[in-house]
Amino acid sequence: MITHFRQAIEETLPWLSSFGADPAGGMTRLLYSPEWLETQQQFKKRMAASGLETRFDEVGNLYGRLNGTEYPQEVVLSGSHIDTVVNGGNLDGQFGALAAWLAIDWLKTQYGAPLRTVEVVAMAEEEGSRFPYVFWGSKNIFGLANPDDVRNICDAKGNSFVDAMKACGFTLPNAPLTPRQDIKAFVELHIEQGCVLESNGQSIGVVNAIVGQRRYTVTLNGESNHAGTTPMGYRRDTVYAFSRICHQSVEKAKRMGDPLVLTFGKVEPRPNTVNVVPGKTTFTIDCRHTDAAVLRDFTQQLENDMRAICDEMDIGIDIDLWMDEEPVPMNKELVATLTELCEREKLNYRVMHSGAGHDAQIFAPRVPTCMIFIPSINGISHNPAERTNITDLAEGVKTLALMLYQLAWQK
């Protein structure tokens, strides 16, 4: 089984990765670009040639379907997104779609038609790399995407969402799509995009939750002044205030420990010149945890600490909480089924959370959902150096195939 999947991956992954490949390495496959369209069209042809019924929905999500014999109205869905970040790797997203097809193709050959219908999905978009909108693919599956939210947006080059969509043969709907009611389970295989599995020598991650996230933009207002003539005790230095906030907050996060993570990712001092005390500094905060209450309490304390530091230093502060996403648990029964499968197959696995967002978080509140992680070498992703050992790739497809067998081929 592993040998079969290794060979299948070695043949199909370079093929699929050729669409949108950058000459200097990596991949760029943005929503409704020519590269995106070619990928979806070629993947559609390949799935059709293997015996699956293929179709696009109204926004470009691609499906490959194998009808069930006893419960054709019940769909077990597997796949991931087909788009990439700019100059990304060839595993994030697309390997989940490819793996679903390889797994279903093998199951069809071994066992014939399933009892329940199985479908591969290559979702149109997840990354938000071209337009300021994320999860366009999965949100449309459940009627969660409002066309008005994208009707007037453009990419960095001024191309409108609507025009890009039309160029690929799709038309923006006038209203949200009708939610699918036939999906009974969703299984997403994905690279970990972190270093936990590799660091522990494990090949499979059973995901039990996707972290909640809170993101802020914070602006500190002090006073710009001469760097040579303003004594230290008379300064309202916003970079100094930021440095105190950053140090204190990161130390608290370290004491809190896993799974809490805290990142000060973007810092913009003004006027940002060598001989002026910075009178304004804007920075971002990204905080994540699997427990909503812990995340809320930690960030509330962080806000209080920032205000206290600024009050002490006579610095004005504006705190904008612009993302507040709850943690998303995976389906307990599917997590248990997947864990039992790993035990039975004697796989080297761990139950873990996902520190990144995935399409599965759109599915999980609506249909039973689980995720399978495979290792990322050196924890690198969103990078041309994104890699996973071929044996781990094959182990992931095998695990997915066994899970789909239980869900669709057994009663």
From Swiss-Prot:
InterPro entries: Allantoate_amidohydrolase, Amidase_Cbmase, Bact_exopeptidase_dim_dom, Peptidase_M20. It catalyses: allantoate + H2O + 2 H(+) = (S)-2-ureidoglycine + NH4(+) + CO2. It is found in: Cytoplasm. GO terms for molecular function: allantoate deiminase activity; manganese ion binding; protein homodimerization activity; zinc ion binding. Its EC number is 3.5.3.9. SUPFAM superfamilies: Bacterial exopeptidase dimerisation domain (SSF55031), Zn-dependent exopeptidases (SSF53187). The keyword Membrane does not apply. Gene3D superfamilies: 3.30.70.360, Zn peptidases. Binds 2 Zn(2+) ions per subunit. Also able to bind Mn(2+). The keyword Protein transport does not apply. Zn(2+) 1 binds at residues 81, 92, 190. Keywords: Cytoplasm, Hydrolase, Metal-binding, Purine metabolism, Zinc. GO terms for biological process: allantoin assimilation pathway; purine nucleobase metabolic process. Its cofactor is Zn(2+). Optimum pH is 8. Less active under acidic conditions. Belongs to the peptidase M20 family. This is Allantoate amidohydrolase. It comes from Escherichia coli (strain K12). The lineage of its organism: Bacteria, Pseudomonadati, Pseudomonadota, Gammaproteobacteria, Enterobacterales.
